[in-house]
Amino acid sequence: MTAQPEIHLMAGGQDWDEIVTAAGQATDERIVVNMGPQHPSTHGVLRLILEIEGETVTDVRCGIGYLHTGIEKNLEYRTWTQGVTFVTRMDYLSPFFNETAYCLGVEQLLGIADEIPERANVIRVLMMELNRISSHLVALATGGMELGAMTAMFLGFREREMILKVFEAITGLRMNHAYVRPGGLAQDLPDGAEQEVRDLLEILPGRLRDMENLLNENYIWKARTQGVGYLDLTGCMALGITGPVLRATGLAHDLRRAQPYCGYENYDFDVVTHQDCDSYGRYLIRVKEMHESIKIAQQCVDRLRPGPVMVDDKKIAWPADLASGPDGLGNSPKHIAKIMGTSMEGLIHHFKLVTEGVRVPAGQVYVAIESPRGELGVHMVSDGGTRPYRVHFRDPSFTNLQSVAAMCEGAMVADLIAAVASIDPVMGGVDR
């Protein structure tokens, strides 16, 4: 008779049957909850699909697409210049960055990147840095509101209102400006705008210090943000995360310094970093970046010199020595009197630009700039016609949302709110 071998089950002192039974019972206690898409703490129509066990998040996934606008597809049916009015509406909190990235790509395809007037580049940088401040103010205001710091919300929107008034004085609109155009700008700064910017830059530093005094050493604020939403450099590199989330890991990566555009290499500013990899570090980075943006904006105002704001090429833009109307369609009285009354050549160019548009040589290009949320890239393809063959945007909010699971799985539900706020996603850019 053959002896039967003895089987010994060892699993940390427990029998496998007991482990399987315990695992099955634990799963029964987990529930799936939808946070959003209509929720005040998801920064727009973001849907977070949570699997929770008690108050602990065991799994989280992002559901997007609720704000899809088809902007990239629409660009294929509009002229290269008309495209500006579409891209400015993607990340609606930082429209100047959308416009500038798009126009830099068109200018590279046209081969006129080195011909942009100095004054136009200075004004572009000025508007982008003011826009960076206004965007960060919204991030801090909404993030504070979601964690119960209502005073931070009031302060943030109060300061942002001053910046939007300057935008309105310069472009005619508080948002969706379509002010940056291929070849330069839609129009020059109006009379008195330079002084308005100087007055704004005198007020902002003190107002920002008020917010810092309120939050930097606030016990509750630090308790809700320190150690929350942790994501180290390895995680950021694996997921392609950029912007304040990446710089909060200690890596000084900023495209304004790494790959300068619009003359950023001529400005004095510091790339702000932090070492803690958490929500509190991202808050500190945004606050300090606003001070650096003020420094850059002050340099811009000092650099302003009289000159054109559009390339002097009648096949690309309205004649640089003539003013265009607020809508950029060249309908100022001076312009109309010139092209309709005395210049047959001007009338021909005007007719071709309006009815057909600019012909962009065939080719493709990728351009990236540093938006308030990270690397905003645009890959555009031209087939040699008057409309893009394809334009694709690499929006930082879309990429950065990938980090939600890495930041929040294993954390508390309350910490999820702080983590998403520290990413600062804008769904217009995610879905576009």
Curated annotation (Swiss-Prot):
It is found in: Cell membrane. It holds the Pfam family Complex1_49kDa. NDH-1 is composed of 14 different subunits. Subunits NuoB, C, D, E, F, and G constitute the peripheral sector of the complex. PROSITE patterns: COMPLEX1_49K. It comes from the Bacteria. Belongs to the complex I 49 kDa subunit family. Its main location: membrane. Its EC number is 7.1.1.-. NDH-1 shuttles electrons from NADH, via FMN and iron-sulfur (Fe-S) centers, to quinones in the respiratory chain. The immediate electron acceptor for the enzyme in this species is believed to be a menaquinone. Couples the redox reaction to proton translocation (for every two electrons transferred, four hydrogen ions are translocated across the cytoplasmic membrane), and thus conserves the redox energy in a proton gradient. Keywords: Cell membrane, Membrane, NAD, Quinone, Translocase, Transport. It catalyses: a quinone + NADH + 5 H(+)(in) = a quinol + NAD(+) + 4 H(+)(out). This is NADH-quinone oxidoreductase subunit D. It is a peripheral membrane protein. GO terms for molecular function: NAD binding; NADH:ubiquinone reductase (non-electrogenic) activity; quinone binding.
